[in-house]
Amino acid sequence: MSTLLWKDRPIKNLTFGLKRISGRNNQGRITRYHRGGGVKRMGRLIDYKRYIWNIFGFVHRVEYDPKRNSLIALIVYSNGVMSYILAPEGLLVGDCIFAKENIVLKPGNSTYLQHIPIGLKINSIELSENKGAQFIRAAGSYATIISKFEKIVILKLKSGELRRVHSNCMATIGSISNFQYIYRNFRKAGFYRLKGWLPVVRGVAMNPVDHPHGGGQGKTSGGRPSVTPYGVITKGKPTRKNKSAFIVRRRKS
């Protein structure tokens, strides 16, 4: 991936304003603690459906997106249309990309799963036809096709999970860029604040009205097993729903 990121402003018509909700729901109640503040950001309109079909486009530049951990690429198509896509690893400025049935198997090209050979890394995968890319969108992520049966494709995710997807769903060749994201170093508390994270306060340091562990005279242990602010046990209680017809094998924990 090219390290020459665009330093200027994004395309204005492909941006929208982002409103921070600071962890509140539609009733104004806190549903996600330790969120708030942060710098003002502009969202980018990402082409998850790759709706420009059978028309080649060139990578005009690679940009930073403040809303996600992966990089994005500005594509200029031969008909003059511009759009942003999630930049896969290995996509360079000046590369030509396509979205069509029969493509060259190189990063950035997009097609149906039925046309992608077994063993190839893919990203930005649809879960349902014409819904747009819904998973494998985070930095450094990818899935691998391990088998095909009639109109069903079996994908293996990085977590080890095996999942069924219809063969008419779209996917993009390659893995998502910026795999070094997991090695980032925030270095100081101010970086967390700029990202919209607030300090994490212990439950035993709160008042009884704020947390089940709160209150008491002096320092206390909380008096009960560790729970969330809503009283749900935090250590050892399964929270994931196990029923899904599309998951062949669960991820490796």
UniProtKB/Swiss-Prot annotation:
Belongs to the universal ribosomal protein uL2 family. The gene is RPL2. Residues 209-234 are annotated as: Disordered. PROSITE patterns: RIBOSOMAL_L2. PANTHER family: LARGE RIBOSOMAL SUBUNIT PROTEIN UL2M, RIBOSOMAL PROTEIN L2. It comes from Acanthamoeba castellanii (Amoeba). This is Large ribosomal subunit protein uL2m. It is found in: Mitochondrion. InterPro entries: NA-bd_OB-fold (IPR012340), Rib_uL2_dom2 (IPR014722), Ribosomal_uL2 (IPR002171), Ribosomal_uL2_bac/org-type (IPR005880), Ribosomal_uL2_C (IPR022669), Ribosomal_uL2_CS (IPR022671), Ribosomal_uL2_dom3 (IPR014726), Ribosomal_uL2_RNA-bd_dom (IPR022666). GO terms for cellular component: mitochondrial large ribosomal subunit. One of its GO terms (biological process) is mitochondrial translation. GO terms for molecular function: RNA binding; structural constituent of ribosome; transferase activity. Gene3D superfamilies: 2.30.30.30, Nucleic acid-binding proteins, Ribosomal protein L2, domain 3. Its main location: mitochondrion. Keywords: Mitochondrion, Ribonucleoprotein, Ribosomal protein. It holds the Pfam family Ribosomal_L2_C.
